[in-house]
Amino acid sequence: MTWHGHRTLKANWFLEFGEGARLIKVYPDSTIEELSRDFHSACDPAISFDASHVLFAGKKTPGDDWNIYEMDINGSNVRRITNGIGNCRSPDYQAMLYTIISPQPWYQLTFVSVAKNISDDYGAGATANLYSCKLDGSEVRRLTYNLTDNMDPFIMSDGRLLFSSRHSSSLNPELSGRISLFGINIDGTDYAVYAEKGERFKRMPCITTKGLVIFIESDQLGADGAGSIGCTLLRRPLRSYRAITKESDGLFLWPSALADCGILVSRRSRDNTDTYGVYRLDPSSGQLELIFDSPDYHDVQAKAVYPRAEPDGRSSVVTEKDPDGRLYCLDVYISDLDNPKWMPRGTIKRLRVLEGCPDIHSSGGAKVPAGLCDGNTPVVQRRILGEIDVESDGSFNIEIPANTPIELQTLDADGMALRSCGWIWARNHEPRGCIGCHEDGELTPENVLVKAVTHPSIKLNLPAEQRRTVDFRRDVMPIILKKCIQCHNKADSTFRIADDSSTDADVAAIYKNLLVAGSRPGDKKYIYPGRARTSPLIWHIFGRNTSRPWDDTFSQQRVLLMPPAEGRALTPDEKRTFVEWIDMGALWDGIPDKDNLQSKGDNGGSNR
């Protein structure tokens, strides 16, 4: 693909990258042939396994949506595949798909789309998801159901998809905004992290003929996604990371595999004095050789035209008539904690299952006051699908609504989240399993029959209108007015609340003050959204530092109980409301919820 050099590469990679670009074929003598004369814009080429066809994203006119097209390798017989489902980008061929309900397998393709206009977990814009369809454009199916961008799909030799995915928002500050490599089956099942080590942002993966996973990485996400080149081994992706290029080598984009174990990649200098040209890179030595460069254009997304082995076919258990999926865990105590003694058996009492609701709602039509979300508070609403006991051996087995973004939180005796995960999901009829809670992905578990799978799955599939939410305006503020104001209405109070704090402005000011930053970068003075156990407000409510040994806030120092002995003590339900509110993101306003539905002790799960 070539793109005129005077164009500025835009940050909106999905809609603006490739605007006005053209597809060209470069011959060995460096002569070129344009293949996309009938298109205003064409980009994202993908070569078929037999090298006879090419998929690409194109726009006939500037006002068109991006759609997926296929043509013969010589540019003839152009046909549109997607139509009327929004902007579609980044196509790639899949291998054969087999199902138990179809007498014949079929070929599919993967693409990226914002067809459903689902907002991300910041509420900032539509989320890009992976989709699949047959080569004739029928049987369009969504594959990813998290609330963050998914992009750059690449088909691996075993038939799974490798792609880049952004970690969920601010409930885990260490991962917030990172883009890592993930793997998934071509039917959307078994979503799992593939490679994380290296720099913060990893994009544009490909795999060489010798089993080297190549990707672009950077610590600062540039407007075009460019960076250095890193790699990991296909056979040990979690433990074999190494950098191939260094910063002084320039900026790189869109690596693709060659038949001789090398890669094609676009490169330019970091000072913006030139345009991208296409180079051959030897991953073992880092040696670069210029292949093609048109000085007036950015030359990117180069793909060599040669036949290659077709990936393994895949089967699928997904049955769309089944509205639910299952999720089981063998042992929540298998984890990545540095010291296993930090979480002895018996620490985890229950499991809370949260649903991510991508659309932003507000009770009674009220609006969230401008500026109240401080950049670390997630915008997406969370609803409680259920809360259940964990088996004595650390296992659980639940049935959840299919194709629904969920977050798991393991809870201690006080109902505080100890560990949590990013957005995951189960497809229709999928029996999804996990070994532990952030376990080592290279290790296999002990071969034991865990207790939870000897019983039917616990159903956590209440109708949406019966799923409980917790928010500040409706649930927390009434407790503050009832139990806290008697001490905090004094002029010398550290956190002062006026006696007449009843207007929306008063309530908004209290909420904003609870989210105020601490004295050090990243610190919070009162609450950490998503982590009740490390929030000083919770320490005072429980009269002790509730942090755990793996938290940097862990301390045995005495904490003053609030309300004090002479005050009106909070009930267990009132304490639990504060805990749930913070663990679920400390949102200002929630989804409308009649009488908050059920009590804190019954969250939709059935317990044996």
What is the predicted role of each segment?
Residues 1, 18, 341, 346-348, ...:
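Aromatic- and Gly/Pro-enriched helix-to-coil junctions and flexible linker segments
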Residues 1-393, 399, 418-433, 444:
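Sequence signature of WD/YWTD-type beta-propeller architectures
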Residues 61, 101-102, 163, 176, ...:
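Alpha-helix boundary/interfacial micro-motifs
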